[in-house]
Amino acid sequence: MAVFTVNGKTVTAEKNQKLLRFLRDELRLTSVKDGCSEGACGTCTVLIDGKPTKACVPQTDKLEGKNILTVEGLSDWEKKVYTWAFGEAGAVQCGFCIPGMVISAKALLDTNPDPSREEAAFAIRNNICRCTGYVKIIDAILLAAKCFREGKLPEAPVDWKVGSRVHRVDVEEKVTGTGQYPDDVYLDGMLYGSAVRSQYPRARVLAIHTEEAKALPGVVCVLTAADIPGINKVGHLKKDWDTMIAVGDITHYLGDAICLVAAKTPEALAQAKALVKVDYEELPAVHNPQEAILPDAPLVHREGNLLAHKHIQRGNPAEALAKSKYLITRRFSTPWTEHAFLEPECAVACPDGDGVLVLSTDQGAYDTQHEIMGMLGLPAEQVKVRNCLVGGGFGGKEDVTVQHHAALIAYLTKRPVKVKLTRAESLLIHPKRHPMEMEFSLGCDENGIIQGVAAECIADTGAYASLGGPVLERACTHGAGPYQYEAYEIDGWAYYTNNPPAGAFRGFGVTQTCFCIETLLNEMADKVGISPWEIRYRNAIRPGGVLPNGQIVDGSTGLVETLEAVKPYYDEAVKNGDPVGLACAMKNAGVGVGIPDTGRTRLTVRDGKLHIFAGASCIGQGLGTVLTQTVCGETGIPRENVVYERSNTWIAPDSGTTSGSRQTLFTGEACIRACQDLKKALEEHSLADLEGQEFYGEYLGKTDPLGADVPNPVSHIAYGYATQLCVLDKDTGRIKQMVAAHDVGKAVNPLSVEGQIEGGVVMSMGYALTERYPIDENCRPTVKFGTLGLFRANQIPEIKPIIVEKPGLNVGGGAIGIGEITSIPTAPAIAEAYRRYDGELRTELPLKNTPYAKK
């Protein structure tokens, strides 16, 4: 037992436990987030006697007489200052890390009221952010310091039209910790659920012994596949992922659920899981595509080890390469990568009539609903899904991980339940970025004009399909780069293995093939005798040009403008003798390739305010702010009369997944269309007169399938374009500056666009230099959150985001999403900078022999 002070009140911890658990579970101080429980991420940072401390580390028995402060304990003035500063700086995206950042900022400003930028970065070095790239968080700390020194608070922006730099609609709840993520939900009588996972990557389950676990006091149920009333398989495009492995069936990876346990307390849950005994027949595993392709390879799935094969061809690349003045062929290798979103997967489910209600953190509430409907055998009206706040996704929360398990327990026990992954489980279970082995050949004429490209790509898609097929397709369609030439051919294969699944990850396959084509272009520039900038400028796709996939691009194409935007920085680096690398990229907005892709929005007048409903997840990218600005700009309704509602499946229309950089364009266009009808109604009525009325907008983006025999195939509604460059310190070899110019069509909120650029750049700096997700001979990842190699605030260089607004797109207000493209060209730009630094051509990620390389 220990007695100490929390936020000015004396409290008693009767039993010894981690401070984090005491603050959250007993005091309900949910601003203190559980991001890892390993002392690594900083989301649980509190002040103990004025010192920032991770609450997941100390035990309560060691805190006798201590004074503890959480964000809830800040003064009203401090809360107002930090809310304004983080809003003004654009420092909030998913928000999961923000309360911990605020506490670290307070610790700094209490002792140093006028810190330098370097001091602010150092103060938050133990707080990881995966969204923002830290730049705007540091800006926010300096703004807060200025407010505290001057004792006054500036007004927030009042102009909410499209193009304004506004504070995001969710700033206050994320800064003060009042917004709810699923793990912040506590319900009366709530159970705690978790899965017993496979001990082997590939083994036949012979028997599951649950008797001892069921007999343990506090245990409510132990469920197996036999208890599932509907279908045991889930999966986005291919139903191959087992909800639980049935007796007699074979496991596919170590993350497979064997059974589900639900208990009244977390302690009873842990004890019960340990009492479940499973009999296995261990079987040989498939460790990589090279093994998967062998004629006598074990089958990961009955139908074979090949998930997908993609072949794309335009023109005759073999002939074009044979006639090329210069030809380069190289092999490339890119690794597994972990999303490392700060919020581990969590869902709360409870009975709802004859069905269930699920509070979820995901990238598509309707996708989650459909998976649960199939598993439970229920119609849509009996399965409701509502998004809480989502603590980051980056593609890693497109597949269900805990939602269906929570729904099953709640449905069968008629009790509310929380199912949450530990950080170790999260690292194992959700799909990662595909590792790929690639070979690219590039041919150019004497002027550096691309004549043709031929390529092959082999991807490890892991244990389940997830989105491996579309990822492979996108890697192939975009492997040609954003350049105009006619001869292109690529073959891609994705193979099942018994490794963790691979699926969607920011960049969606393009990150891998971009590394290849851009590295070859940099090498080719030397052969031709021109600069890497010049070879891109000569080949850049321009309005009216034809991409290697056959699509004629429209007037909104802004690649040349991004090249021109970085030219002064490139020339300055060359003049100063600083090693500099350059790379370009393009990325589609929307699903495309002939697949129906629809955005939908419903505007409802309630209590004199306009409520925005869109069934699209806001995972940190700022969709709620985009739609709010759209409504304010299109209708003239004041910001204070507009309410953005979180996604759900019973009022908000299905707007598709938050993926493919699609929501700003597709749901944004749907919102514009709904606003047009509302605006007409407002010509004759006040908003109050329209009480109870609804205004609906829908936009279907029509595209052509790959290989469509039409004169101008439209693979995608729109593309974003980018040029990034990396400048090294010529003495230390460390990155001095990253410059990122991105064509976004129209920046709805430039503040958010800059934040997306900065965050994407830092994420792919890690991809290029430091991040690792090693898997051992047992198909088990051997990392913890703290050893992933994520960049910290005091390690980032100057980042210069440049917004290019090329008009011409006639939907979505001209705006093109940039959630993915911001991290695509970063790695090849960095690789080229190091080639200029030491002459070594690097074709494998993470890059070797740099000051950042793991010793």
Task: Describe the predicted segments one by one.
Residues 225-226, 377-382, 412-417, 446, ...:
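C-terminal catalytic domains of large/alpha subunits in multi-subunit enzymes
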Residues 46, 173, 179, 346-351, ...:
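Short beta-strand elements
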Residues 1-155, 593:
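Signature of N-terminal electron-transfer/Fe-S-associated modules in redox systems
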Residues 393-414, 418-419, 623:
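Thiamine diphosphate
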Residues 257, 263-265, 414-462, 669-688:
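Phosphate/diphosphate-binding loops
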Residues 294-376, 540-609, 689-714, 784-792:
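Helix-loop-helix junctions that connect adjacent transmembrane helices in secondary transporters/permeases
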Residues 90, 164, 170-176, 305-347, ...:
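Glycine-rich loop/linker segments at domain edges
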Residues 145-307, 327, 412:
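Flexible, low-hydrophobicity surface segments
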